[in-house]
Swiss-Prot record:
Region of interest: Disordered: 114-189
Organism of provenance: Rattus norvegicus
Subcellular localization: Cytoplasm; Postsynaptic density; Synapse; Cell projection, Dendritic spine
Signal peptide (from-to): none
Keywords (A to Z) from UniProt: Acetylation, Cell projection, Coiled coil, Cytoplasm, Phosphoprotein, Synapse
Protein name: Homer protein homolog 1
Result, substituting Q76R: Normal binding
Principal location listed in the UniProt entry: cytoplasm
Family: Belongs to the Homer family.
Length: 366
């Protein structure tokens, strides 16, 4: 097409099985480049992928297309024009998301382009209908001629209805066959000019495509010549390398043996260094173990001393408990004796009180 890709990525390409409509059929043995292109001639966006010189994807993006993510690394879309469903397997979820974003972006661009094309058609058809007395249909644009089937179908539907109306619309404005003939003549002239312009556009596009094809053919021939020259140079260098290998085989053997010895010595030195480091580590561990043993012995001795001290304290505690019990017993006996004395004292006091009262009575009587 001559355009540069807008966005490219790599993926494994699949198509739905036309028989079962369920299974995926791989169309590429390995990951291939899948690119978005903008066709300025037809004002459309395309998805194109080549496997060598074979086009395995050539899909025009239309506003009614939808790209669906069916898994983290796989997506698909249906192309009604090609009557198939394409599937792409990506190496990562990021690549899939990026491709889906671009698909949505170019789908929106295709929708806007289609709306602009329809607006242009309406603006162009309005003056034509007025000048012909409502006798002309909407002229076709290059986009409607060169676009997809989805884009062309609405144009045919819209333009098919006015074809049956020119005579009816012309009746209120003309009442003679001469006027109708003149209107048809003007309409035919306008349509002829329009198709002449379309033909010139198509010829220009054909010339561009022919030039691009010739350029591609010339490039292929040039690449084939360069490839042949590279192959001859590679064969010559291969022969030269073989000769040099034969001449320097002995030197290479000595050098190889020397290299092996050097590597062996280096490996032994590294092994010895590792062993020395291991010995130092073991010595350090032994010293640490000795220190731990000394600390353990010291702690064991302290523990024994603490246990002896604990036993002494337990003996003292037992003796104090016995003394406390004895003291409590003595205190209880003292309290009992004291209570007995208080009771005796109360009795004596009562007797003395009675004696006093009796003496007082005697004194009063005498």
């Amino acid at each position: 097409m001559g355009e540069q890709p807008i966005f490219s990525t790599r993926a494994h390409v699949f198509q739905i099985d036309p028989n079962t409509k369920k299974n995926w059929v791989p169309t590429s043995k390995h990951a291939v480049t899948v690119s978005y292109f903008y066709d300025s001639t037809r004002n459309v966006y395309r998805i194109i992928s080549l496997d060598g010189s074979k086009a395995i994807i050539n899909s025009t993006i239309t506003p009614n297309m939808t790209f669906t993510k069916t898994s983290q690394k796989f997506g698909q879309w249906a192309d009604s024009r090609a009557n198939t469903v394409y599937g792409l397997g990506f190496s990562s979820e990021h690549h899939l998301s990026k491709f889906a974003e671009k698909f949505q972006e170019f789908k929106e661009a295709a929708r806007l382009a289609k709306e602009k094309s329809q607006e242009k058609m309406e603006l162009t058809s309005t003056p034509s209908q007025e000048s012909a007395g409502g006798d002309l249909q909407s002229p076709l644009t290059p986009e409607s001629i060169n676009g997809t089937d989805d884009e062309r179908t609405p144009d045919v539907t819209q333009n098919s209805e006015p074809r049956a109306e020119p005579a009816q619309n012309a009746l209120p404005f003309s009442h003679s066959a001469g006027d109708r003939t003149q209107g048809l003549s003007h309409a035919s002239s306008a349509i002829s000019k329009h198709w002449e312009a379309e033909l010139a556009t198509l010829k220009g596009n054909n010339a561009k495509l022919t030039a691009a094809l010739l350029e591609s053919t010339a490039n292929v021939k040039q690449w084939k010549q360069q490839l042949a020259a590279y192959q001859e140079e590679a064969e010559r260098l291969h022969k030269r390398v073989t000769e040099l290998e034969c001449v320097s085989s002995q030197a290479n053997a000595v050098h190889s043996h020397k290299t092996e010895l050097s590597q062996t010595v280096q490996e032994l030195e590294e092994t010895l260094k590792v062993k020395e480091e291991e010995i130092e580590r073991l010595k350090q561990e032994i010293d640490n173990a000795r220190e731990l043993q000394e600390q353990r012995d010291s702690l064991t001795q302290k523990l024994q001393e603490v246990e002896i001290r604990n036993k002494d304290l337990e003996g003292q505690l037992s003796e104090l408990e016995q003394r406390l019990e004895k003291s409590q017993s003595e205190q209880d006996a003292f309290r009992s004796n004291l209570k007995t004395l208080l009771e005796i004292l109360d009795g004596k006091i009562f007797e003395l009180t009675e004696l006093r009262d009796n003496l007082a009575k005697l004194l009063e009587c005498s």
